[in-house]
Amino acid sequence: MKNIFLIFVSVLLILSCSGDDNSLNNLMESEDFLKNNLSNPGVFEIEAGLQYEKLKTGGSGISPSLEDVINADFHGTLLDGSVFWSSIENGEPLVVTLAQLIPGCQKAISLMEVGDSWKLFIHPDLAYGTAGRPGIPSNSLLIFEVSLHSIET
């Protein structure tokens, strides 16, 4: 019986270590991507771990605050291009208080103006970190294309 228990514990340890390797690999890939991405024309850094590229400029002069409710389209992908969530594919923009979004989205979208479309590159520390989410492995860099349609104060 003692041997079965030891085998069981060993298997659990091996499985838990492989998950840590994936998490560490994701983190290293995220950091490498962000470092290299800054050399691309049109990519700017808001702060360490948060980059954007302007796809379309609205020019309204109106930006949301954290308390505002925004109406926006989001298309979220991982580094491998797989889509983890898309309001566009769902056929309906997201209407949400800006403060309810992940920190990277909060910071970037608060700088956008109504009518803008930006591509955001968000380090795991400003997203879901080591916790991950269904469809989002731990320590994953998130890429969002965001179109800010309106602000409801």
Question: Across the structure, where does each feature detected by a protein language model lie?
Answer:
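Cross-family detector of peptidyl-prolyl cis-trans isomerase
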Residues: F5, C17-T153
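Sec-dependent bacterial lipoprotein signal peptides
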Residues: M1-L15
